Structure formats: structure tokens, C-alpha cells
């Protein structure tokens, strides 16, 4: 990799570290190419990204970013998983690490907060941003639905009473 390519990579990584809300660092020693492809596809489906970069270049790219607290974790064969959703990368990384013991989560950073491996695992148990939005919408809609049911209930009861009265009148006429 020539000097210009390294500078481009550092600039790209710096932009990523500046804009993402979560970065997970893990050792990937022993993962096969098929395993890495599977991990990348799972991350992509969740809206996250996996990047393998030289630790030295990643250290340079971390300067001046909120997630600079992950610098001590960049030793050995490390990969960086990141996402704008604070939970997506952590969920996929933890789930993949459970299924494949060769992926070892070292820690991460959420904004300026450094996370140890247990912190990343705890973060992975939280619902995603989309799930939280769906719950909030459901909570907001539930009272409106109940109000509509309460308002419509007397009218429906009256309609049933009139219907039953009409049916009884028809049976009386037929008899």
C-alpha cells in the first residue's frame, strides 16, 4: 500500500469514527474466509460494517474522534465493527462470537464512553432503534384505539338492540 492509499484509508477511517455512534473491536485470528464473509453479510443486513485495517493506521485515524478510547485495544489481528445504530454492530458481533469462538470481542466505544467486553454484550441485549420506535408508536396508538372503542361501543350496543327488536317484531308478525 503506497503512501497516498494509506492517507486515503486514514481519512476514510477518521470520517467513519467521527460519524458512527458505536465501534466494536474484536480479534479475528483463526476465522476462515467463509466465516468473515458470513460476518460481513450479517453486519450488512443489520446496517453495520466490518473493517480490517492496520492497527497503526487505525490509531492515526482515531486521533481527534470521540471513540479514541479504543486505541489500547488495537493490538494483534483486530477487526472494527461499526454502525450508526448504537446496538446493531454489537448485536451481530456478540451473536457471531457465540456461534464462532474464534471471534473474541475485546471491547469498544459508544461515543466517548469506552466499553469492555461485558459492556458490549450488555449493549447487544438492548432493543435496536427501530424496535424502540415501534414500541413508542404502539404505546402512543394504544390509548387512541381504546378511546375509539369506548366512543363506538354505545352506538354498537344500540344497533344490536334495535336489530334484536326488529328480529323479534318479524318473528311476532310471522306467528
UniProtKB/Swiss-Prot annotation:
Official protein name in the record: Large ribosomal subunit protein uL10
Gene Ontology CC terms: large ribosomal subunit
rRNA-binding among keywords: yes
Native source organism of the sequence: Methylobacterium nodulans (strain LMG 21967 / CNCM I-2342 / ORS 2060)
GO terms under biological process: translation
Name of the gene encoding the protein in the UniProt record: rplJ
HAMAP family (alphabetical): Ribosomal_uL10
InterPro entries: Ribosomal_uL10, Ribosomal_uL10-like_sf, Ribosomal_uL10_bac, Ribosomal_uL10_bac_type, Ribosomal_uL10_CS_bac
PANTHER family cross-referenced by the UniProt entry: 39S RIBOSOMAL PROTEIN L10, MITOCHONDRIAL
Amino acid at each position: 500500500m503506497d503512501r497516498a492509499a494509506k492517507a486515503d484509508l486514514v481519512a476514510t477511517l477518521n470520517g467513519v469514527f467521527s460519524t458512527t455512534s458505536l465501534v466494536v473491536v474484536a480479534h479475528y485470528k483463526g476465522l476462515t474466509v467463509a466465516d468473515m464473509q458470513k460476518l460481513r453479510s450479517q453486519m450488512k443486513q443489520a446496517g453495520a460494517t466490518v473493517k480490517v485495517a492496520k492497527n497503526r493506521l487505525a490509531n492515526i485515524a482515531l486521533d481527534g474522534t470521540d471513540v479514541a478510547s479504543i486505541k489500547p485495544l488495537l493490538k494483534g489481528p483486530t477487526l472494527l465493527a461499526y454502525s450508526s445504530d448504537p446496538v446493531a454492530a454489537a448485536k451481530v458481533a456478540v451473536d457471531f462470537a457465540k456461534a464462532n469462538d474464534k471471534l473474541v470481542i475485546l471491547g469498544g466505544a459508544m461515543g466517548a464512553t469506552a466499553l469492555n467486553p461485558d459492556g458490549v454484550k450488555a449493549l447487544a441485549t438492548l432493543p435496536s432503534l427501530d424496535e424502540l420506535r415501534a414500541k413508542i408508536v404502539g404505546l402512543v396508538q394504544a390509548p387512541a384505539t381504546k378511546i375509539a372503542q369506548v366512543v363506538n361501543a354505545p352506538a354498537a350496543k344500540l344497533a344490536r338492540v334495535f336489530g334484536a327488536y326488529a328480529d323479534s317484531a318479524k318473528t311476532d308478525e310471522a306467528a
